[in-house]
Swiss-Prot record:
It is an enzyme of class 2 (transferase). Keywords: Cytoplasm, Glycosyltransferase, Purine salvage, Transferase. This is Xanthine phosphoribosyltransferase. It catalyses: XMP + diphosphate = xanthine + 5-phospho-alpha-D-ribose 1-diphosphate. 5-phospho-alpha-D-ribose 1-diphosphate binds at A128, N129, G130, Q131, A132. It comes from the Bacteria. Homodimer. CDD domains: PRTases_typeI. It comes from Pediococcus pentosaceus (strain ATCC 25745 / CCUG 21536 / LMG 10740 / 183-1w).
Length: 190
């Protein structure tokens, strides 16, 4: 998606250890118009999958997931990273490691919001090592729901995350595919 690649080139910051900082438009401040276009594109790419729900992980996946839900006219359910008083014990859970935060989180989704009749599309901001997607796939397996696709805003193709999805023969669509983050701060796209 050229619009997204241009935004990454102009505002993304390459940090050490293959980290791409995009907090100016995706995961701190959100460019709503860009998210709207991202949602429309995911809606187009997964149109034939008869999606009934979208799953994501809080918090950076929420903006693109909501815009995709709007484009597809389906609800969005996000996995919570922290248990709150409003979350009951009737939950699907999975453990997810965050490379950028160097922590593990127990993600949870209430059993009230997903069931085995659902055809789920997973949307997330980044795909690198595949931990967040893997956690959502674990929850989908526990709920016995059909995952019909995974939509990623930014994929680091030089890391192994996509293999988890390919091994399960799930449609994967990444709007920006990065093949390298260079030492001099450049982003190289496929």
């Amino acid at each position: 998606m050229k619009l997204l690649e241009d935004k990454i080139k102009s505002e993304g910051i390459v940090l050490p250890n293959n980290v791409l900082k995009v907090d100016g438009f995706l995961n701190h401040q959100v460019d709503a118009q860009l998210m709207f276009e991202i949602g429309k594109e995911f809606g187009r790419l997964f149109k034939k999958q008869n999606v009934t729900k979208i799953l994501t992980v809080e918090s950076s996946g929420i903006a693109p997931a909501v815009m995709t839900g709007l484009a597809m006219d389906v609800p969005v359910v996000f996995a919570r990273k922290h248990k709150s008083l409003t979350l009951t014990d009737d939950l699907y859970t999975a453990s997810v490691y965050s490379y950028t935060k160097q922590t593990s989180n127990q993600i949870s989704i209430s059993k009230r919001f997903i069931d085995e009749k659902d055809r789920v599309l997973i949307i997330d901001d980044f795909l690198a090592n595949g931990q967040a997607v893997s956690g959502l796939l674990d929850i989908a397996d526990a709920a016995n729901i059909d995952v019909v696709g995974v939509g990623i805003v930014i994929e680091k193709t030089f890391q192994k995350g996509s293999q988890i999805i390919k091994d399960r023969d799930i449609q994967l669509e990444s709007l920006a595919r990065i093949k390298a983050l260079t030492d001099d701060g450049q982003v190289e796209f496929e």
